[in-house]
Structure formats: C-alpha cells, structure tokens
Amino acid sequence: MPVPEPYPPCWTWLPLPRGEVAEPLARRWLGERLGCPPEELSLPRDDHGRPQLGGRFARWDGNWSHSGAGLLVALGRDVRLGIDLEWVRPRPRAMELARRFFTASEADAIANLPPAQREPAFLRLWCAKEAVLKAHGRGLAFGLDKFEFEISDTGICLVRCDAALGDPAQWSLRELGPQPGYVGAMAWRPE
C-alpha cells in the first residue's frame, strides 16, 4: 500500500472506553495510515516523553489525545504536530484558570464575551494552546502564557510566541468538532 502524504495533517476520532490505554489504539490507526503493522511501528519517546515516529517513518509525526470516552489521533509528514481533545462539561473556574494561565489579553478577551460564551471560548483556547504545546513537545510546564492567540469570529490565530516556538506565522491551527460534546484542536508547523 502506498504511504499517504496528507497535508494539512489528517486526524481521526476513535471511541476509547474510559480507563483504557490510548496508545495501542493510536498505534493501530497510525500503522493503518502508514501501511505498517502496528507492532512494527517504532514509537520511541523523546527526553520529555513525547512519542515520535521512527525508522522509515522518521519524516512523519503522529500525536494523540484522549478525554472522556474519545481519542483523537493525528498524522502529518514533514511537520511537527500536536492535537488536543477536551470533553465539554461545566467548568465553573474557567475565568479563574484563564486569568492564572493565559496571557492578560487572552483572559480579557474571554471576560469581555457574553457570560454564556465564556466557557466555550476558554475551552477552545485551552485546546489550541495544548495542541501547540504538544507539538512543541514540552507540555504544560513550558507555560501557557508564553504564546498568545487572538480569538475572532473566524477562528483562533497565533499572534505572538516565545522564540523557542519559532515564528508565529509558521504555525497552523485547525479547530475540531470531532463528536457532539467534544472540542479539539490540531496545531502544526513545518519541520
């Protein structure tokens, strides 16, 4: 089977029963997309625990995220990508978390929305930020305030970031609505 060359990166939603480990299911989907038996797919972890495709698929990047009863898996070639999934549920501390972890401009943008739109906007922004951090490979410890998104009616756009993340113009973001009751985001930049 020829190896697909998706661009922008492709992604899928897979049901994942609560309590089950995500990696075997992610590995199976990645293997199917790459035409490789899952048990032969090399997925070593870097020093920060981020999985990386190895061997003949070293030019590819895969990432996954699970929440609730779902799993998102992404795959791209010649890109560094991250994906995040969040189960939609009440988050009464959304504004408190935004003020604590987001940039002041992002928190203000959420606070200036009508009350009914604040939690959904918080969750969309959280997913976007996690997707970038997962692509970067440092996770939340890197700092959610080291880069800034602008939220508009047309979507979310990265406008400023720490030098370690590179040029904001190099980043692409796709918001995902994979299933009712879930939101997600996929972020990538050229490798």
Where are the model-predicted features located?
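Core catalytic alpha/beta fold that binds nucleotide/phospho-ligands
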Residues: 1-191
